[in-house]
Amino acid sequence: NSARPSPEPRRRPAATAPVRRFGARVCRHPLCVLLLADAHDRAARGDTLQAVKVHAYHAPLTEPGSADLTAHVDFGALGKAARDAGAVVFGPVTQGAFLTSLGIQTRAKALSQASSAHVREIDEALARLTSDEGMGALFKVMALSSPGLPAPPGFE
């Protein structure tokens, strides 16, 4: 069989360094750091670099500066690095669950009532941000907090 197994996920120590610094900082000063990213609970296999231009996938190295670049974030590794530095970690939770717990539906309803001409736009944006078919499940939210602080909004 000539098929090669996919490479094991690579840990990237440089990626966790800023989180370790935040973790140490939250132990010295009462604060909370919110992380929101296209994330997973563990490292993805292979290269996850991708580009998005006008809401569509785009070749990452074509037309530099014209597209948004992203890569999957390993929230499992980041959470461990923050905990190892002494921070309290909340989440990750999906973006949809996070925004819902903050009351995004109530806000969307108020916006729609204030501007009936934009109801469709508001409904589409709400669905894109919160639905499992859109960014609601793809993006995750995690908070790093000082020990002793209450859970931040969205993580109660």
Feature roles, as predicted:
Residues 1-156:
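Long, Lys/Arg- and hydrophobic-enriched amphipathic alpha-helices
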